[in-house]
Amino acid sequence: MEELAQSEFFEPLKELWMYENLVGDEGAKALAESEQLTRLRYLSLYTNRIGDEGAVALANSKTLSKLETLDLSFNRIGDRGAEALANSKHLKKLKELHLDANRIGLRGMQALAKLSGLQNLQILNLSYNRIDLQGLELLNDSKRLQEMSAVKTDYPHIGG
């Protein structure tokens, strides 16, 4: 993946769909560090066995600063990865974040309820995570999430 991420063929890309490719944390790190992806607006990495390390690398990527949509659904991202994404200083243009079917629990929900780093985010998908009653209340009471176009969870009274 590291060689592919450095390929000149990646340079003109605005969209990259790499779902179901076993990218893993190392592959996510290679993409995050790739200097060839500076034009990327849409990145789909669902079902790739990406965990917290990969999510942290993507959140800290200066290369992906133009990203508007990030799909990390059906991976292995937990609280640490969710916190890094929610507090990212580099994904300022992100409008859509798909984190459905991961392993995000209460700590991750707390960070996502605040979304201190993703000021332009309008759509957040958190369906099929480890949302308990306390996490549900955090999401429901979040002023930041109430301002968004859509927040998707497994619960019909939160988001839509």
Predicted regions: what they are:
Residues 8-11, 35-38, 62-65, 89-92, ...:
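Inter-repeat linker/turn residues at the boundaries of leucine-rich repeats
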Residues 1-6, 24-33, 52-60, 79-87, ...:
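Leucine-rich repeat
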Residues 13-18, 40-45, 67-72, 94-99, ...:
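Conserved hydrophobic beta-strand positions in leucine-rich repeat
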Residues 2-3, 12, 28, 39-40, ...:
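Amphipathic alpha-helical scaffolding segments comprising HEAT/armadillo-like alpha-solenoid repeats
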Residues 116-160:
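Leucine-rich solenoid repeat scaffolds
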